[in-house]
């Protein structure tokens, strides 16, 4: 079986109207959501699929640096292909990072060819399900957060993650109301997403310490990224206060930084997105280190159901004592609560994911286990431009976001807030 083509398709879902969300230091506007579907086509007619970063930068890297390397090569051993790639084009750090997403499609192909699920190619499953947390909650009133948490619990989830940042006192009121709404046996995660430090009007260190201490009263499962993600020493100091478990990792640039995060005593939960942070091999090495360190792992997943599925195939190869959680983004539909509509996220799969009492039941079919619906390629054409903007009160500026992880949050494109807001 030889690889004929490697394709990266950018997709977009535009919101009917821009969604404006107000936080402590300004306003966020969401215009659309983007995604990437990777296709690897072989001479046997089999096609492998993978999720990718929804950015032109990622597409250009795949098409110029990864596709030429893979085209014409036999697909029998993805690990051997990786070694050759890292000795050649993969010496470029950005291409090495992007290769992890394409590699998921290679495993999907190999699983289909051999008639086994991807999990059997990357260690072997030790369980058939993985615990999910419903992830939504973005910049609302405390009452709206509580209403959404109740709705997500009604969908069968037993955990809810929210993005806080509407002001310290309002954040605490939000957690109080959510805990009242869902009861004591429901897990809550608070994601500060480093935005507590965006602009001049931010949460200073003393405020963050006080919030962490107050959150302990409500039995919060973790506090995520309350500080700049590259400051591991600051995380270690906060963790030493032992108020609430601390989580971080989705912005680590490479494996070396991950190892420092794990070994420095900075966090209780390590997070990683397999689409944009090294793929299966990197995650497997980190899982071993996390297990030795007595920490826990939680997948970051902020895209489509295909990304959730790809992560789950890996997660079930490790016990829940190491790989505990998988993020499940909850987008809104006419009948369900969520952040905003993003129908592409579910429609990329022909069959819905099976969720039972808050656990994803991981399919045993060949490859990733669920067929991709290629009609999304025509139904959701790419729309160039940023998908979101942060309008910061002080200093007055707008920061555009081109994809969740295409560039560090503190290096986003900036322009004067006094300028007219750009169109997508």
Regions found by a protein language model. Name each.
Residues 4-20, 29-30, 304-305, 309-424:
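Flexible C-terminal active-site loop/helix
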Residues 128-242, 424:
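Metal-dependent enolase-superfamily TIM-barrel catalytic cores that perform enediolate-based chemistry
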Residues 1-37, 55-58, 67-74:
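Motif-centric detector for short Cys/His coordination patterns
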Residues 7, 41-113, 332-336, 401-423:
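Metal- or metallocofactor-binding catalytic centers and their adjacent structured scaffolds
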Residues 3, 45, 66, 102, ...:
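Conserved, mostly hydrophobic/aromatic
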Residues 60, 219, 230-247, 252-359, ...:
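Shared catalytic-loop signature of beta/alpha-barrel
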Residues 41, 103-139, 173, 185:
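Glycine-rich, aromatic-flanked loop segments that form ligand/cofactor-binding clefts
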Residues 36-42, 352-355:
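Short beta-strand elements
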């Amino acid at each position: 079986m030889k690889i004929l083509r490697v394709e990266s398709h950018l997709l977009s879902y535009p919101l009917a109207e821009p969604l404006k969300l107000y936080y402590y230091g300004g306003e966020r506007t969401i215009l659309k959501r983007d995604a990437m579907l990777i296709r690897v086509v072989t001479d046997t007619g089999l096609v492998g699929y993978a999720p990718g970063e929804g950015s032109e930068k990622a597409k250009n890297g795949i098409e110029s640096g990864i596709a030429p390397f893979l085209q014409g090569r036999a697909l029998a051993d993805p690990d051997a292909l990786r070694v050759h790639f890292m000795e050649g084009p993969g010496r470029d750090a950005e291409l090495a990072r992007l290769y992890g997403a394409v590699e998921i499609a290679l495993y999907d192909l190999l699983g289909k060819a051999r008639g086994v699920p991807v999990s059997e190619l990357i260690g072997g499953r030790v369980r058939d399900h993985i615990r999910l947390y419903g992830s939504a909650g973005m910049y609302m009133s405390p009452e709206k957060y509580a209403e959404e948490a109740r709705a997500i619990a009604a969908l069968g989830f037993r955990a809810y993650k929210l993005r806080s940042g509407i002001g310290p006192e309002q954040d605490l009121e939000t957690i109080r109301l959510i805990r009242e709404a869902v009861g004591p046996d429901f897990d809550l995660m608070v994601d500060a997403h480093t935005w507590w430090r965006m602009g001049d009007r931010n949460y200073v260190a003393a405020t963050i310490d006080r919030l962490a201490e107050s959150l302990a009263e409500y039995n919060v499962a973790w506090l995520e990224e309350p500080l700049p993600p590259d400051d591991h020493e600051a995380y270690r100091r906060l963790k030493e206060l032992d108020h609430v478990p601390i989580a971080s990792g989705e912005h680590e640039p490479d494996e070396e930084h991950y190892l420092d995060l794990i070994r420095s005593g900075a966090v209780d939960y390590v997070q990683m997105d397999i689409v944009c942070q090294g793929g299966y091999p990197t995650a497997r090495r980190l899982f071993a280190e996390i297990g030795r360190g007595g920490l826990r792992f939680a997948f970051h997943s902020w895209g489509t159901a295909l990304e959730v599925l790809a992560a789950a195939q890996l997660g079930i190869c490790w016990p829940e004592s190491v790989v505990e959680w998988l993020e499940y983004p909850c987008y809104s539909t006419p009948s369900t609560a969520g952040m905003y509509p993003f129908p592409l996220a579910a429609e990329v799969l022909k069959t819905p994911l099976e969720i039972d009492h808050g656990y994803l039941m991981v399919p045993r079919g060949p490859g990733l286990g669920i067929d991709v619906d290629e009609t999304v390629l025509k139904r959701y054409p790419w729309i160039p431009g940023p998908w979101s903007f942060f309008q910061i009160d002080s200093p007055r500026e707008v920061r555009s976001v081109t994809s969740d992880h295409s560039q560090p949050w503190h290096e986003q494109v900036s322009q004067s807030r006094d300028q007219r807001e750009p169109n997508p």
